[in-house]
Amino acid sequence: MENENKPNVANFEAAVAAKDYEKACSELLLILSQLDSNFGGIHEIEFEYPAQLQDLEQEKIVYFCTRMATAITTLFSDPVLEISDLGVQRFLVYQRWLALIFASSPFVNADHILQTYNREPNRKNSLEIHLDSSKSSLIKFCILYLPESNVNLNLDVMWNISPELCASLCFALQSPRFVGTSTAFNKRATILQWFPRHLDQLKNLNNIPSAISHDVYMHCSYDTSVNKHDVKRALNHVIRRHIESEYGWKDRDVAHIGYRNNKPVMVVLLEHFHSAHSIYRTHSTSMIAAREHFYLIGLGSPSVDQAGQEVFDEFHLVAGDNMKQKLEFIRSVCESNGAAIFYMPSIGMDMTTIFASNTRLAPIQAIALGHPATTHSDFIEYVIVEDDYVGSEECFSETLLRLPKDALPYVPSALAPEKVDYLLRENPEVVNIGIASTTMKLNPYFLEALKAIRDRAKVKVHFHFALGQSNGITHPYVERFIKSYLGDSATAHPHSPYHQYLRILHNCDMMVNPFPFGNTNGIIDMVTLGLVGVCKTGAEVHEHIDEGLFKRLGLPEWLIANTVDEYVERAVRLAENHQERLELRRYIIENNGLNTLFTGDPRPMGQVFLEKLNAFLKEN
């Protein structure tokens, strides 16, 4: 009995073979849900595999994906299969895992299934699929139209047939944590241009997969277009209409300002905030310092550990079984304490912060750049940011509160090594180039640049990708993508524990940073290991932060590229000139530049907030 509800590949295959399609869909959703919980890991899904694969983890994953893709093909190719309106929403929430099953198998995509839905035998182009007029066919098409699909899709036609189904597909196609290949990347780029004005027409979130709203909100930052964040504005409008019509939401009357211990109150809504997380390391010191002027109340999830809770005068778990209840709880805390400031150190990684950003909870509402991008919210007035991280203020809908560059001093990672034995190779036969990157930061433009570095360098180079989030069924797909550009000149290391990740980078001679979405922690890790590298700067904070950090660390400005051509040229120079590279590394090691990131005056944020509050009180 214990194993009956455990995800099991054989149970899924048996239900498909028996044409028990309701059970087959339930079994499939159970497997997809487990993949989602495990970030793509297959270790809690039961399936038998040949003993020969016992110690071959990647081959075992490809075997799993191939078996799953084969059974899904049989299931979805049968015209008898019907998926309900509710069913399609459940499948689209998990579409990214369906996509990875096919992408990490020899199938690559599910176009061979979509071809079975074609009803026009005399079509001129095999990539044109002519569906019958039933909603059932459109539903199945949407579930299996994946990021790697080569089939043509006219979004305008689909919108005219079913706006909510079209919007749901657009949500699903923006949800993967890896959209790196040119096919997938261009698909998302097209959606980011087309979708905002259409999304804004929806009355509410009722018939779209709102559980992945935060992926739509956050993943747009990894695109390259100037207006890539416009989708947030449309999503914010729909969320606002939804909470007003479905929740009966009323904003807090912010005329009353309360005081605790003779201080105005700042309510802080947290996402990921524990001592091991980067948001804690980058934003805790400034909040502790703000307690000089404000009484700080922290609101967060059970993942906020003791160190995270101790940042605040008091801390509460956000109560509520659903979003309506959570928002009402946050409002009640703000109301009962007469909050003067509502502050979120980060926004975009959790649904609660995004929904809260579309409400009025305090007279002054601000975010910091834990996820470095604008909110495009009508309810957020200010963004806290260090002055040297700003590329262009035009990237923001908010007013920037630009603090001195040492006003948000970092807390060193608890996992950072106490001692590093630096590996300084005088004249390596192969220059090992490290890349610290999550899967989300990989894209075709970055890989083309790496390919150009390899081709132009007069020395042999080898790229080591120390990848975050490349787990389970994600990794074979990511590895194939990297190899498609760099072949044997690259090693794609799957997601690994921090010390193992550092060991990969430790064995490198230099690093290069991803673009357009750069690194913060990756640069700290680089300098910790006595390495130097190249970055590309730009207008967005998530591009410009690399430049700011390089300058703070005392690295020469030639390592900061303004264009892709400069990036390639500087990386080639660093790879070819061993003596110059070693001198830079020794300079970094001897000057301990990291101390500049861990020291500073964290008081300006509290002072600036107090100035804004006093100005508000004077006017009101």
Curated annotation (Swiss-Prot):
Keyword Transferase in record: yes
Lineage: Bacteria, Pseudomonadati, Pseudomonadota, Gammaproteobacteria, Pasteurellales
Gene Ontology terms for molecular function: glycosyltransferase activity
One GO BP: protein glycosylation
Protein name, entry field: UDP-glucose:protein N-beta-glucosyltransferase
Compartments it resides in: Cytoplasm
Superkingdom of this protein's organism: Bacteria
Similarity-based family: Belongs to the glycosyltransferase 41 family.
